[in-house]
Amino acid sequence: MTTSSPTTTTIAKAHGRFIRGSVSKVRRVLDQIRGRTYRDALIMLEFMPYRSTGPITKVLRSAVANAEHNLGLDPASLVIAQASADMGPSMKRYRPRAQGRAFAIKKQTCHISIAVAAQTDS
């Protein structure tokens, strides 16, 4: 049995569930902000031309508020440690088509998870 040194990094998390939008479109934005500081990520999200930046910004602000309120961390020193998007349930709708047929439409949802941690000076 090996013992590892305990890590005392404090991480604050936030989750957004059942967000309308496909997982691939949300992941391309999360890949851009992962590992960046909170301020840099907010600036990037503000000027990105994607619709998924709105819910991502909301979840990021919630994670920072959790770090500030629950752990007493300074928002200026926070960095995005983890950012992921998982597939949620699809809402099924039907569109009428020619000759009495029905065409299935899947409205996709996803779950967004963001974790922020205090920046280490190394």
Swiss-Prot record:
It comes from the Bacteria. Keywords: Ribonucleoprotein, Ribosomal protein, RNA-binding, rRNA-binding. GO terms for cellular component: cytosolic large ribosomal subunit. GO terms for molecular function: rRNA binding; structural constituent of ribosome. The keyword Transferase does not apply. The keyword Cell membrane does not apply. PROSITE patterns: RIBOSOMAL_L22. Coiled coil: none annotated. One of its GO terms (biological process) is translation. Belongs to the universal ribosomal protein uL22 family. NCBIfam families: rplV_bact (TIGR01044). PANTHER family: CHLOROPLAST 50S RIBOSOMAL PROTEIN L22-RELATED, LARGE RIBOSOMAL SUBUNIT PROTEIN UL22M. Part of the 50S ribosomal subunit. This protein binds specifically to 23S rRNA; its binding is stimulated by other ribosomal proteins, e.g. L4, L17, and L20. It is important during the early stages of 50S assembly. It makes multiple contacts with different domains of the 23S rRNA in the assembled 50S subunit and ribosome. HAMAP family: Ribosomal_uL22_B. This is Large ribosomal subunit protein uL22. It comes from Prochlorococcus marinus (strain MIT 9313).
